[in-house]
Amino acid sequence: MAKLSKKQKNQAASVDSQKLYGVDEAIALAKQNATSKFDETIEVALNLGVDPRHADQMVRGVVTLPKGTGKDVRVGVFARGAKADEAKAAGAEVVGAEDLLETIQGGTVDFDRCIATPDMMGLVGRLGKILGPKGLMPNPKLGTVTMNVAEAVKAAKGGQVEFRVEKAGIIHSGIGKASFPAEDLRANFDAFVDAIVKAKPTGAKGKYLKKAAVSSTMGPGVKIDVADVAGA
């Protein structure tokens, strides 16, 4: 086991690993422990009472964080003609059809979100083995297969994040940067949790929101008292 650095020891000492903190105090501690030279992301992790191996217990969706993510999101769009022009005008960095297919098949995936018009899905489907594992496959349920490409591009760049529960019932997301004011991080935290609560699947039994924590990219996790979480 690697030795902890002095900075890591100081960070660990500032957080009581046995204590459940209120949301505001937890966010303040996560910000306090974001001491790297880069602007660390503040992340939230939730442990849900679901088993995603069952189709009726899958938790997936999108949410727009009201204060944005602080990230520069590159958007790729599969579209032709006027819809391709709309995507470019809305700020999409990568727009194309067969040419974009060939670029991706050649090993270059130069975007963080992928949007497609419905008529492009036959083409995009051939990229499933490349885009799927990266979480980039356009999906009509997530609003990324649409004729409203301009709106989708602006949403992707304006603070919209996708979420999907993992095998152990964990769901996580960045909710902003450490440089954000604490109240902005709280607003994003509340919006994210609210979306998760609204996405509660029909097959979920017992307690839904079991555990919660926040952390910075390089900092320790700060456990949250779920009784202090709206909608828990």
UniProtKB/Swiss-Prot annotation:
Gene Ontology MF terms in the entry: rRNA binding; structural constituent of ribosome; tRNA binding
Name recorded for this polypeptide: Large ribosomal subunit protein uL1
Protein function: Binds directly to 23S rRNA. The L1 stalk is quite mobile in the ribosome, and is involved in E site tRNA release. Protein L1 is also a translational repressor protein, it controls the translation of the L11 operon by binding to its mRNA.
Family per record: Belongs to the universal ribosomal protein uL1 family.
Gene name in the database record: rplA
Lineage: Bacteria, Pseudomonadati, Pseudomonadota, Alphaproteobacteria, Sphingomonadales
Gene Ontology CC terms, in alphabetical order: cytosolic large ribosomal subunit
Domain of life, per lineage: Bacteria
CDD domains listed in its UniProt record: Ribosomal_L1
PROSITE patterns, A to Z: RIBOSOMAL_L1 (PS01199)
Gene Ontology BP, a term: translation
Keywords noted in UniProt: Repressor, Ribonucleoprotein, Ribosomal protein, RNA-binding, rRNA-binding, Translation regulation, tRNA-binding
Pfam families for this protein: Ribosomal_L1
Subunit structure, as described in the record: Part of the 50S ribosomal subunit.
Ribosomal protein found in the keyword field: yes
